[in-house]
Amino acid sequence: MSKPARRVAVTGAAGQIAYSLLFRIARGDLLGDDQPVILQLLELPHALDALRGVVMELEDCAFPLLQSVEISDDPRVAFRDADYAMLVGSRPRGKGMERRDLLAANAAIFRSQGEALNEVANRQVKVLVVGNPANTNAWVARHYAPDLPADAITAMIRLDHNRAVSKLAARCGVTVDAVSRMAVWGNHSPTMFPDYRHALIDQQPAPMRVGDERWYLDTFIPEVARRGTAIIEARGASSAASAANAAIDQMRDWIRGSGGRWVSMSIVSGGEYGIPRGLMFGMPTICSEGRYRVVPDLEIDALARARIDASVAELVDEMQAVRAILAL
């Protein structure tokens, strides 16, 4: 007997990230090759015709697991009974656009979506915010979804995690599966901290394997942190396929478990590592049985403390700005 279908809501569904995301969900990359899915897609009214074209393509793929596709411009329709929600749509970040400009443009969007999730989604829904500024957008959505579990809403920092793993593997001449225990802390912004001090490469400590502290400080950290900007400058648009892949990775591990591996997620802080409670902050986690837990008892040296504190300060500033915008 086949399993009951799971409902997956995706916002910004006619956009570039979603175009790389939806077909993988329908194929089973998110929930597994034996789990039927219903896609519930949200778009702005002016983009519904384009979304209908995407739906035609989904239909033409004849995915065995895709039970049906529903589209709407109303979040209360798109989120109804959703088991999982991937909030991809946001005001896009263009070349040279400041993050502060994004705050005002996105606060109302994620207020509305948080309220809708609170009202109509499955009570055990898992929500991943992809649209930037992801951490603060997730904070807004969570604020307006008080009836959902405290850990129901997360933000994506897996793209930064994947970038860090890839760069470290390339430096050491190994494949990415040789790298483990990578940690990315903080905001999805240039202040985030890709931390390889606890990482292993073929079970050897990464700092010893790399053997070059200056490369870590002067190349690895800034290039991982600014990779998104480099992509915008190169292609004239933000990351799409790699962002979709990271969204699948983060949500899949949260749902199905990370197999003991460390995976970076932006989650609501419970005060771990001196990070203020309630802040949406990237941390190393391990996922199992549909839950995540923060990797405990890591040494935080002076460098890590300074980097983490810088990202905390940025997120607190964003949160305070959004509070003023929304009169909270």
From Swiss-Prot:
Quote the catalytic residue positions.
Answer: H188
GO molecular function ontology, one term from the record: L-malate dehydrogenase (NAD+) activity
- CDD domains with a match to the protein in the record: MDH_chloroplast-like
Keyword NAD listed? The answer is yes
Question: A Pfam family this protein belongs to?
Answer: Ldh_1_C
- PANTHER family tied to this protein: MALATE DEHYDROGENASE (PTHR23382)
Q: What is this protein called?
A: Malate dehydrogenase 1
- Origin organism is Burkholderia vietnamiensis (strain G4 / LMG 22486) (Burkholderia cepacia (strain R1808))
